[in-house]
Amino acid sequence: MCSLPRGFEPQVPEDLERRSLAELREMLKRQERLLRNEKFICKLPDKGKKIFDSFAKLKAAIAECEEVRRKSELCHPVSLDCKLRQKAIAEVDVGTDKAQNSDPILDTSSLVPGCSSVDNIKSSQTSQNQGLGRPTLEGDEETSEVEYSVNKGPASSNRDRVPPSSEASEYHLQHRVSSQAEDTSSSFDNLFIDRLQRITIADQGEQQSENASTKNLTGLSSGTQKKPHYMEVLEMRAKNPVPQLHKFKTNVLPFRQNDSSSHCQKSRSPISSEERRRRDKQHLDDITAARLLPLHHMPTQLLSIEESLALQKQRKQKYEEMQAKLAAQKLAERLNIKMRSYNPEGESSGRYREVRDEDDDWSSDEF
């Protein structure tokens, strides 16, 4: 019988409820890893039935946790509202406890003829508004409606029993909470109205006049101010420029101001090209012992289009002739052709004739 490795045993249903969502997902990954191993599942006696059951339970538990989490996220703003309401109710309860402590004072006021709980509420509200310094319109309307309903009632209602002081104090505290909320809303409204009142629309003519006046004021202020130091330095440098220092060069005579002035005067006068060439040559002779080679060709000249085309054609023709000669020479070298003088009779025939002539001369001498 094969046993599951440690950490991969199927969990008991009671344990799943106590686990967190991250732990449940980790357990689900382990079960999936076991289910992928088919050889291991085939070796089990129940063929992995327990693993499948635990896998399904884990999936159901994860789905339930996600559903609870989603509902809690949806109900989060509602819970915040409920907390705020609970705080307000707690404040009201504290106020009722304080009011119950002051019951004897309220009872003495209720014994006075012609006085009712509504009058007490009105007096307390007016004192509160005087202390805050900001009465609200809605609160006044509510108090007027209450007074109207009380006065409109039958005379027998005045003879009835006066309501207890605890109910009056509770109503008073609830009304105070509502009045505080109305005060905050009215303060926001007043702030918005103040911001709107600060916005002003001006004409273009008035704006231009304001701009001109501001420019005049700035001009007067700038006229009275002193120029900055760097502006004065720049103006002085523009009036009295500093002579530029020439860089040191080898094989060059030191620069002199008189020579430069005389050179400027000479340059102003017209000089021919031959005179300039002669001066340049003299200058080279003064500064160096080297001599330029004589020119073998004429200097460059400006030619017309027709002359340039004719020269290009002539050059192309010479180039082709030279290429043909080189090609013929290379071909002859490959074929091993040698140009020699041709003698059809050969050297032997010539020698024979020369010998025969000698014999003839010898025979003639004998005779």
Curated annotation (Swiss-Prot):
Record PTM: Dephosphorylated at Ser-269 by the PNUTS-PP1 complex, promoting RNA polymerase II transcription pause-release.
Region (Interaction with Pol II): 226-297, 314-339
Keywords: Coiled coil, DNA-directed RNA polymerase, Nucleus, Phosphoprotein, Transcription
Family: Belongs to the GRINL1 family.
Protein name (database record): DNA-directed RNA polymerase II subunit GRINL1A
Region (Important for transcription repressor activity): 29-68, 298-313
InterPro entries: GRINL1, Tuftelin_GRINL1A/MYZAP/CCD68
Pfam families on file: GCOM2 (PF15328)
Biased composition (Polar residues): 117-131, 176-185, 205-225
Subcellular location: Nucleus
Binding partners and assembly: Component of the Pol II(G) complex, which contains the RNA polymerase II (Pol II) core complex subunits and POLR2M isoform 1. Pol II(G) appears to be an abundant form of Pol II.
GO cellular component, one term: transcription preinitiation complex
Modification sites for Phosphoserine: S269
Ranges where the record places region Disordered: 117-185, 203-225, 254-281, 335-367
Gene Ontology BP terms: intracellular signal transduction; maintenance of ER location; transcription elongation by RNA polymerase II
GO molecular function: transcription elongation factor activity
Broad class of where this protein is predominantly found: nucleus
GN (gene name): POLR2M
UniProt feature coiled coil, ranges: 15-40, 300-329
Function field: Appears to be a stable component of the Pol II(G) complex form of RNA polymerase II (Pol II). Pol II synthesizes mRNA precursors and many functional non-coding RNAs and is the central component of the basal RNA polymerase II transcription machinery. May play a role in the Mediator complex-dependent regulation of transcription activation. Acts as a negative regulator of transcriptional activation; this repression is relieved by the Mediator complex, which restores Pol II(G) activator-dependent transcription to a level equivalent to that of Pol II.
Keyword hit for Lipoprotein: no
Stretches with biased composition (Acidic residues): 357-367
